[in-house]
Amino acid sequence: MRNIYSIYKEHYKALISLGLPIVIGQIGVIVLGFADTLMIGHHSTIELGAASFVNNVFNLVIIFSTGFSYGLTPIVGGLYGTHQYASAGQALRNSLLANLLVAFLLTIGMTVLYFNVGNLGQPEELIPLIKPYYLVLLASLVFVMLFNGFKQFTDGITDTKTAMWILLGGNMLNIIGNYILIYGKLGLPEMGLLGAGISTLFSRIMMVVVFIIVFMRSPRFLRFKLGFYRLGWSKAIFGRLNSLGWPIAFQMGMETASFSLSAVMIGWLGTIALASHQVMLAISQFTFMMYYGMGAAVAVRVSNFNGQGDILNVRRSAYAGFHLMMALGVVLSSIVFLCRNYLGGWFTDSTEVAAMVTSLILPFLVYQFGDGLQITFANALRGISDVKLMMLIAFIAYFLISLPVGYFCGFVLEWGIIGVWMAFPFGLTSAGLMLWWRFHHKTKLPPSIQNS
């Protein structure tokens, strides 16, 4: 054990140093999600059900678009690892354009969905609440994509603190805005769920504005700004952003789609089940976002070493990340387990919702291993720019395994919401195992290194 620690010690330190600011930034996102759910839930259980539906739909779109922006990380990470700073700045310029185009396409698709939202089998009483909230979140999509472009760039150059501070500030602004607009403080009208949406839109706009100001004015970005301004557009970089970004987007999108489509199925069970699902999603995002921070650090480290052609440290960075991910999973799962009987009551006054939340803790705990496994090795594969097979893996794991199992357990066996949630461990663990095998196969060490 001591020998293993000595081998991975430097990687542990580097990953924690890189990942901790990302994790702290994600804690801000988690706190925002909790605050949203708490404030909306205590304002109205019906509004909580409406928020659950809309947030699930937009989580799919936002994670899909975030996945596309991840294509920048291995490009910038490789350039930064070989000291090509001007080219890294040029990559950012091209990434912002690509992200804007993707945001435009997604906005068109989501507008079409808006006009058909009444045909998705949701409870009739939720539709008047769903529609205005949906439109406000739709308006914020372009700002999410611009923020992601800057964030993936700064992560790729190992500056994870800038995005952390901007995220924390934006989320604090969002929480304050929620309180004022949901409950009608400072002389403003009580807007409920719509107020939460307006607050989210405003905070996302401000985060982009602040990121632009920091990039333009901070001296530490000077060597990158030369390439950003002077090297212009690059067909090669733009093409590579698309060849990397789309497979990652579809891989992440299919994972999220399994949760979003599960929310549609849960909506068939009624408002109480949908509200319970929203509470559990807020809790599950607590662990996912923490894993995400460490996974992003793995992608950066792997891309840096991959740019240098150092396969040994590519592998060690990935496995060190997995060790840390599992340790984090044990800690987080223990916290959730110890608080299992209180979680539902923190989010809503409804005893029915609180009881249903407690019943979902077991499937939640079971899938933590699979979630940590798939996040680690999906990011490791992104770091080595091996992303195309991830789409097939995601399709098998989430559409051929997770969704059918969820429908079978939830509706054929009549286990209800617990049955739908029992599918998540199957999908995430199967995805993790396939992604691990792909990474293991693609990073085999030469015999000379193996022997040494």
Label the predicted regions.
Residues M1-G19, V76-V142, L188-G245, V302-Y367, ...:
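Short alpha-helical transmembrane segments in multi-pass integral membrane proteins
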Residues S17-D36, V136, F147, G170, ...:
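Transmembrane helical elements of multi-pass membrane transporters/channels
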